[in-house]
Amino acid sequence: MKTITSSSETSHFPVMLNEVIKISSPHKGGFFVDCTFGGGGYSKSILKYPKTKLIGIDRDKSVTSNAKKLEKKFKNRFKFFQVKFSQIDKILKENADTIIFDLGLSSLQLKNLSRGFSFHSKDELDMTMGLSDFSAKEAVNNLGEIQLKSIIKILGEEKEAKIIAKNIVKARSDKKITKVVELVKIIEKSKKIKFPSKINPSTKTFQALRIFVNKEITELINGMVNATKYLKPGGKIVIITFHSIEDKIVKFFFKNFSKNKSNPSRYLPEESSDNLALFENYINKIIKPSKEEIRNNNPSRSAKLRFAVRSKNNFFYPKIFFQKFNEYLKIEAYNV
């Protein structure tokens, strides 16, 4: 969650900004890439340092006007592209010093009820972040029960996925599901909640559908690989995650393709050596927001930051990385 919204105005508080700045060291100058531009919080903070230049990327066209203002202000030091960050290799012409990913849903997207991300919305069941092939409405009305179950169970980590999927199919046989509130009612009737819960019963199903609609796992895996290809030796890739699936993927990539992997991973070829290390020694430590930041920006409470440093070794395509998480990739490839 990248921002919070006050009652009077929209304020941008990029998560763990101080930590990102400390890791990326923009005071030394260099070339940076903000792969999830959003409200521009990281980009603006980095561009304050005069010897920096930066490319901003975001799939959401709603951020374009803000990005254009930044282009005008910083001229040849900043350029914005409305593309998916998996296409970073199609944009970059030179290697970067730091590449930043702040994953997940921004509160700008969540607060805009017309986009259908919030289960408090009364609008269309959309959930598209931008440049998506289909909406959540199309997914829940067109996919089979088994496919819906897989999406909700695997991408949402929802234990009651089977009954939720069954009831979605049953409900749509009478009337097409078009509104957020309609899906919320189906989920609430399906869930076995016997006492008040801190977590809304729709949370995991909504997460699953959002991830599926925007192919977030496919984007993340391809984005990390392509970003690594365009990092300078000694360059840093910084990733902030907000749920366990994202963090598991990032951890695996950094840990298994670093020089100090403790034991040869069963996912790496037998001839694995330092020559197959894309990263320098990886410090397997999660950085979390401070208590003060969580008080000021409650959505940051679930954020986890990991970073890795690019080695001098030649880039290679890590096929086993894709194989390891093929279950997620196959689900996101369902035809709608």
Please place each PLM-identified region on the residue numbering.
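S-adenosyl-L-methionine-dependent methyltransferase catalytic core, i.e., the SAM/SAH-binding region
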Residues: 1-336
